Every structure is written in structure tokens, then in C-alpha cells.
């Protein structure tokens, strides 16, 4: 049996002992604190690689396994390229799930949270993610949320945090308000799934709209580095629209209503005005016309059904600014009070929603466009749409009946939450109800222990019931604390900066460290955060830039979104009973097998169906890697004498790794490693394991494999007799001669008879060709015990060994 086949049989019959490797190397890596960055190293170039931090809702799941596999792949890649890599870890540990679990089980949300953090931390360490654990943070630690409060006060000082009474999104299940970004298109809560209703409450907002243009314009800085769909989602969410605000007089109010439109050319098709159910003008008109009770009842029912074409005749009229005609005014369920002034000039002849509403309420439908030209539009008839748009706008502005405006879909960020487990808002109120910011020296405003607090959602903040905490006597006066807590997306809007100075107690981070490490070079996480976390982080970064705390305008230079891990095509969930348990899979298959199999399954952005993930194939490959490393001698001849064909394959892979990583084609690298191993094993059969090209190939595989399966790679590296650790090894430099030069087939003879062939470079030297020919196992065997009288060498075509007769 050939040696190669024997080795293959051995590998397939051997169990891949992943547990032994994990038990061997995990404590060594932890002991040596292998992945802590050297802050004193000012010479080595730096990279900051970050995974979106985890919420501690239980043990890790397969979604975590996928995300951390990709993030760790990139961090290890940059280390192998000679960079000092910051790759920190932490937990987004405030939030509703902990509070709801505490209510359900009668426990403390703090205890529940930190128990889950400990469990996840153990799993993360086993998973061999190369984190710098010295920078670990939890957003529920006072040492962290102190700086949440500091940041809030900075925003308040600059007029970007304010409190007002407004219609807000109310989650009736979690009994707290939601930001617009947390309400799904179907009107349900992004977290609880409950139908969201509207409530009028006094709440805290952040003026993100002040940054709308910059948030939109600076997306151009991220093109080709962020997924296009994320950029598109943010662009659409910000929703910049250029148009005209047109004045419609309402005689019963004795004042006009301003209506924003992007299509002023349709003004002659207006047959009614539609107002938002919850606007003040709507209530005022309903009250004057005696239909306020109907409005309130209808609004309440609409909140429950989310019906899109319900309305109410307000029995009032507006005056058309150009024709002078009276136009009926309706309250309409499809009009948003917080967008474009909460009023729409309705053109049912050219808008499908307006048309449905007009049909339902028997309102006129007028066509004013035909073949892209205006009709029935007075002096503007016959003009093209573009001409009429400009001319009507100009005339309205000239008559002071309109003005050019830019409107945004983006609304200010509502951050008040009527729940316990979050950052207290650092504001006091005096006896007159005036707002007084807490002094920075008095931070943090500590969250009181939950013992004795009724956490059951009531619509009121649980903190309001702790009178000793709420009421504060200071300088002879009585003050009352704000009892709401902050949206936890505030916590995550700047956490990547706290990693730079996690132990600093004089500032959240320093400008020096921000300049040194920021911004994040590579960010890894799910697309579900496109218009939540990612937008908020961009806003806060721009604010910090404005006040001189960072010197960059965007937080994350590059972004990779991974797909979901599904089972039989369905999203995993506890309710469906189709959860694949992380700990069970790791126990059964091992970390390295899972990591390699996940990455090999396809491009990161695509969903992975767990049933299609090949554990057996991954385990077989890793076993062969270790067994092949054992075949390679500790010392080999000069590399220049290595097999040319194998070196071409090795250097082709080395040459392609950079662009494959840059384009996130990690699965292609996995396939190339498997190919290189197969080629190497076949070469062992023909040229022997002691050929220096064999060692070069296996060392290259070990270094590259560290990005996938670090336990196996570290074991291979030790077997090969190299200096610990493989994670510090650099990729060999690419020898471009193997990429550019042509090869040819050289004939190897003994006494003029063909005994073998070699694939060699056309510029191979006589010495190299003779050495390579002698290294062929068939030639080595034939010349054993015989004296070579003469060597005839004609590079690159021929080597003939002339031997003494037996």
C-alpha cells in the first residue's frame, strides 16, 4: 500500500481528539494573556477589529458562533500581517429581557444578568476568540454608565437633549415607550411583537435631526466599505426630501396650515386636505365642529387595528391658495403627525393612498396630468411636469403662499424608558418643575438595588416608587430625580470608545487613545442594526467630533453583516423548538470543527442552514492537517531546492489571501487550504516528506488555519518544531517568481532510460535541477548503493545519471 493511502486510512480511522487540544491550549493562552495589545508599542501598525457586543440573555447561540468566527478570523489575519490588533469584548447588559426575566422568576435583574455574562464568558474563552480580556466591560456597571450620564449632560449642554410632551410609540406589552426605529413596518414592537399604540407623554429626546444632513452626506465616505443595503436603509430612513411648504388658510382657525409637498405641480388636483389623527390642529378643528368624541374613539380603535384608510370628516374647509376654492378637511389614519407637518394636500388622481381614501369617503378625483404634461391646471396647462414644478413653486413663493423647504423622515431619538434596568437620567427637578442637570462631580447617579421595588410594568417608572431615592435634599432645598431610564441603544452608541480606556476614571476615554486606535477598522454584526445602533453610533461620533473628543467623523470604517444560522430554512427560536444549542454542539464536535465548518459553508452575508453544515468533512480535514504535520521532518534542505510545482500552489494561495480577506471570501480560503493539503499529501508520495516545499506548504496551512481553527493550528505549529505561538507567526512573503515565470517538464533518466519527470521553472539552475531530480523517491531508490559516474544536465529539459554497472 502506498504511504499516502496508508496515511489517509490512518486519518479516517482516527478520532479527531478536539477535546485534548482544547484542554491543552486554552489554559496556556489564558495564562500567557496572548491577545492583550501592547500599548507601549508605537512602531507596529495598528488595527481595531470589533464584534457587536452580546446581550447576556443566556448562553451563546449559533448566531454568536458565526459572528465571532468571522470577527476572530479578521483579527487573527491582521496579526499574521504584522499588526498590533485591538480586539476587545464586552456585554450590552442593561435592558428589558433581564427585567422581564426577573419579574417572571421573582429574581434580581442584576443577578440574572451577571450570571448569564459569566456563562457566556466561559463559552467565549472556549470558543478561542482572540479577545483582549483586560478591556472587558459591562454597560450595567456604574463605572460604565457613569459615562452614559456624562455624555447625556454634554448633549444637554449643547442643546441636543431636550424634554417635551409628544405623541409617542407605546408598547402595551412591555409598557414602555419606543423610538420610531424600534417599531416595525407592520406597526409591532421590534422587541415584544405587540401592536404599538400612540400615547401623549413628556419624554426625553436627542436632537439627531440636527445631524440629518451630515448623517446622509457622510454615507458617501462608507461606500464600498459598508454593505450597500445598509447604506440604502440609512439613506431611506433619514429620508431627505426637497419640496415646498404651501399655505392653506382655514377660516375657522383664522390661521393657515402649512402643508409640505415634493410635488407642487399637483396642486390643481387637490380635492381634500388630510391631517394626522393626533395633531393639535386636528383636535382643534374637531372640537370646533363637535366631532372631538368621534375623533378620540376612532383614534383609539385605529391604534388597535392599524387600519390604513380610516378617516373622519372634520366638517371644516381650507382655501386653495391658487384657485380660492374651498377644500374639505379630513383626519386620516395614513398621515403621520411627526412627518412633513402632519398635513397632506391630497391628490387622489395621482396617488394610490389618496385615491383609496377618496373612494371610501366619496371625494372627487381629478386628473391633472397626461403624457407627462399638466392639464386642467390653469395657466400651467401644457407645461411639462418639470417646468410646472418650478413655475408653481416660484409663483407660490412670490405671493408669500409657500417657501422652499427640505424635510426629513428622520425623527428625534426618544430615549426615555419607563423601566428599571437601565441608566438613570441625570436630571433633577426643583419645586417649580425646572430641569437642573446633575453636577459631573456627583456622577454616577446610581441605580438603586431592586430589592423591594415592584418591577411589574405599570406604565410608570419603577424608580418613581423609591421615595428615598427620588427625593433629594440639597443646599436646603428639595429636588426630585427624573425617574425614567435611558434607551439601551444609548449605551451601545459609544461603547467602542470605552474599550480604548476601560479603566480611566477621569474621562470616558482620552483623545490620545482615540487618535491612536480610532476609528474601528472592521466592525462585524447583523444587518438588523442598520437604522438603530449603527445610525445612533454615527450620530454620537459626530457629536463627539464636534466637541473635540475624537478626531474622526465615522465610527466604523468597514462593516460586515453576517447572515442568520437557520435550521431547515426556518429561523431558530425557542417557541418553534428548533434551537441548536451552542454548548451541545461544541461538546459533540469541538470548537475548531464548528468554526471551520461555519466559515466553509458560504459567504458571510448568506444565511447558513445548520442541516447543511458538514461537521464530518471539517473534522476529517483537521485530522489530516495534524497527521500530515507529523510526517514533516523538523529540519529540511534549503527552500530554493524545494519542489517547484508545490511552491507555485503555496505562493498562489499566499498571493490571494489578501484580496480574499478584503472581499470577505473566507470560505474560498478554506477551500484553497483543503486543495493545498491534498496536493501536498500527493507530493509526499512522489517527492518525499523531507522536500523543503512540503514544510513550506504545511507551515502556510498552519498559519492560515489559525484564522479558522486555532487549536489545531497551534498543535500543528508545535509539531513542526516552531516557536510558540502560531498566532504570532507572519505569513511568508510571496515569491512572485512562482507567479510570473513559466514552467516546463524535465525528463529524469538513469543510463538514458526514463525514470521520472519533474515540473520545474524554465530558469532553473543546473544545481537545483540535479538536486530536485535526486530527491524523487523513484530516483533515490534506483541510485541507492550505486556509484554515479557522471551527471548530464541540460536545464530545464533533462537530467541523466550515468552509473557504474552493478
From Swiss-Prot:
One of its GO terms (biological process) is leucyl-tRNA aminoacylation. ATP binds at residue 574. It is an enzyme of class 6 (ligase). GO terms for molecular function: aminoacyl-tRNA deacylase activity; ATP binding; leucine-tRNA ligase activity. InterPro entries: aa-tRNA-synth_I_CS, aa-tRNA-synth_Ia, Leu-tRNA-ligase, Leu_tRNA-synth_edit, M/V/L/I-tRNA-synth_anticd-bd, Methionyl/Leucyl_tRNA_Synth, Rossmann-like_a/b/a_fold, tRNAsynth_Ia_anticodon-bd. PROSITE patterns: AA_TRNA_LIGASE_I. This is Leucine--tRNA ligase. It comes from Tropheryma whipplei (strain TW08/27).
Amino acid at each position: 500500500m502506498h504511504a499516502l493511502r496508508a496515511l489517509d486510512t490512518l486519518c479516517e480511522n482516527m478520532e479527531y481528539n478536539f477535546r485534548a487540544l482544547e484542554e491543552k491550549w486554552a489554559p496556556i493562552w489564558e495564562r500567557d494573556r496572548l491577545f492583550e495589545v501592547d500599548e507601549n508599542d508605537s512602531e507596529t501598525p495598528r488595527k481595531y477589529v470589533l464584534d457587536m457586543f452580546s446581550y447576556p440573555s443566556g448562553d451563546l447561540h449559533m448566531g454568536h458562533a458565526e459572528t465571532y468566527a468571522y470577527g476572530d478570523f479578521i483579527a487573527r489575519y491582521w496579526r499574521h500581517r504584522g499588526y498590533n490588533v485591538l480586539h476587545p469584548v464586552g456585554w450590552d447588559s442593561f435592558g428589558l429581557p433581564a427585567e422581564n426575566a426577573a419579574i417572571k422568576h421573582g429574581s434580581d435583574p442584576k443577578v440574572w444578568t451577571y450570571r448569564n455574562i459569566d456563562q457566556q464568558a466561559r463559552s467565549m474563552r472556549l470558543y478561542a476568540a482572540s479577545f483582549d480580556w483586560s478591556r472587558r466591560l459591562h454597560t450595567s456597571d456604574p463605572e460604565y454608565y457613569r459615562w452614559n450620564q456624562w455624555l447625556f449632560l454634554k448633549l444637554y449642554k449643547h442643546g441636543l437633549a431636550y424634554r417635551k410632551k409628544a405623541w409617542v410609540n407605546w408598547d402595551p406589552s412591555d409598557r414602555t415607550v419606543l423610538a420610531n426605529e424600534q417599531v416595525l413596518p407592520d406597526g409591532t414592537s421590534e422587541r415584544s411583537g405587540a401592536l404599538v399604540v400612540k400615547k401623549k407623554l413628556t419624554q426625553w429626546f436627542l436632537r439627531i435631526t440636527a445631524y440629518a444632513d451630515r448623517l446622509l452626506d457622510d454615507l458617501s465616505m462608507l461606500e464600498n466599505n459598508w454593505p450597500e443595503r445598509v447604506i440604502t436603509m440609512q439613506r431611506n430612513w433619514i429620508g431627505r426630501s426637497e419640496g415646498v411648504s404651501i399655505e392653506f388658510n382655514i377660516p375657522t382657525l383664522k390661521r393657515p396650515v402649512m402643508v409640505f409637498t415634493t410635488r407642487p405641480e399637483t396642486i390643481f388636483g387637490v380635492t381634500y386636505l388630510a391631517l394626522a389623527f393626533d395633531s393639535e390642529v386636528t383636535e382643534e378643528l374637531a372640537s370646533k365642529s363637535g366631532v372631538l368624541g368621534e375623533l378620540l374613539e376612532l383614534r383609539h380603535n385605529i391604534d388597535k387595528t392599524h387600519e390604513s384608510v380610516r378617516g373622519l370628516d372634520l366638517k371644516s374647509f381650507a382655501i386653495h391658495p391658487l384657485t380660492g376654492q374651498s377644500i374639505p378637511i379630513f383626519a386620516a389614519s395614513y398621515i403621520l403627525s411627526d412627518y412633513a407637518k402632519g398635513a397632506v394636500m391630497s391628490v387622489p388622481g395621482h396617488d394610490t393612498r389618496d385615491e383609496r381614501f377618496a373612494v371610501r369617503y366619496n371625494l372627487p378625483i381629478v386628473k391633472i396630468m397626461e403624457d407627462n404634461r399638466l392639464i386642467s391646471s390653469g395657466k400651467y396647462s401644457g407645461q411639462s411636469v418639470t417646468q410646472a414644478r418650478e413655475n408653481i413653486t416660484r409663483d407660490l413663493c412670490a405671493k408669500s403662499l409657500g417657501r422652499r423647504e427640505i424635510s426629513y423622515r428622520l425623527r428625534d431619538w426618544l430615549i426615555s424608558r419607563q423601566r428599571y434596568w437601565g441608566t438613570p437620567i441625570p436630571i433633577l427637578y426643583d419645586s417649580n418643575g425646572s430641569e437642573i442637570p446633575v453636577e459631573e462631580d456627583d456622577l454616577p447617579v446610581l441605580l438603586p438595588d431592586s430589592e423591594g421595588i415592584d418591577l411589574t410594568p405599570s406604565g410608570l417608572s419603577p424608580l418613581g416608587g423609591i421615595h428615598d431615592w427620588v427625593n433629594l435634599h440639597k443646599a436646603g432645598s428639595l429636588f426630585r430625580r427624573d425617574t425614567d431610564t435611558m434607551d439601551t441603544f444609548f449605551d451601545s452608541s459609544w461603547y467602542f470608545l470605552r474599550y480604548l480606556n476601560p479603566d480611566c476614571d477621569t474621562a470616558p476615554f482620552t483623545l490620545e487613545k482615540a487618535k491612536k486606535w480610532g476609528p474601528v477598522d472592521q466592525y462585524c454584526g447583523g444587518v438588523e442594526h442598520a437604522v438603530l445602533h449603527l445610525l445612533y453610533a454615527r450620530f454620537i461620533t459626530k457629536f463627539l467630533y464636534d466637541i473635540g473628543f475624537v478626531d474622526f467623523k465615522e465610527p466604523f470604517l468597514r462593516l460586515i453583516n453576517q447572515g442568520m444560522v437557520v435550521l431547515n430554512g426556518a429561523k431558530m427560536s425557542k417557541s418553534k423548538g428548533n434551537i441548536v444549542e451552542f454548548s451541545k454542539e461544541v461538546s459533540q464536535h469541538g470548537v475548531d470543527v464548528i468554526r471551520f465548518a461555519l466559515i466553509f459553508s458560504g459567504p458571510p452575508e448568506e444565511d447558513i442552514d445548520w442541516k447543511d453544515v458538514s461537521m464530518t468533512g471539517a473534522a476529517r480535514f483537521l485530522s489530516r492537517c495534524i497527521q500530515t504535520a507529523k510526517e514533516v521532518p523538523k529540519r529540511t534542505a534549503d527552500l530554493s531546492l524545494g519542489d517547484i510545482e508545490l511552491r507555485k500552489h503555496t505562493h498562489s494561495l499566499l498571493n490571494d489571501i489578501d484580496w480574499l480577506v478584503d472581499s470577505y471570501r473566507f470560505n474560498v480560503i478554506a477551500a484553497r487550504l483543503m486543495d493545498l493539503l491534498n496536493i501536498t499529501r500527493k507530493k509526499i508520495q512522489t517527492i518525499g516528506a523531507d522536500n523543503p516545499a512540503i514544510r513550506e506548504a504545511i507551515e502556510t496551512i498552519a498559519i492560515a488555519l489559525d484564522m479558522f481553527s486555532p487549536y489545531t493550528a497551534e498543535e500543528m505549529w508545535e509539531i513542526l518544531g516552531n516557536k510558540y505561538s502560531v498566532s504570532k507567526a507572519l505569513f511568508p512573503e510571496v515569491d512572485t517568481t512562482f507567479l510570473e515565470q513559466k514552467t516546463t517538464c524535465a525528463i529524469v533518466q538513469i543510463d538514458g532510460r526514463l525514470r521520472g519527470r519533474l515540473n520545474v521553472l524554465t530558469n532553473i539552475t543546473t544545481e537545483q535541477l540535479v538536486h530536485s531530480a535526486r530527491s524523487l523517491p523513484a530516483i533515490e531508490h534506483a541510485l541507492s548503493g550505486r556509484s554515479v559516474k557522471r551527471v548530464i544536465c541540460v536545464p530545464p529539459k533533462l537530467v541523466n545519471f550515468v552509473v557504474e554497472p552493478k
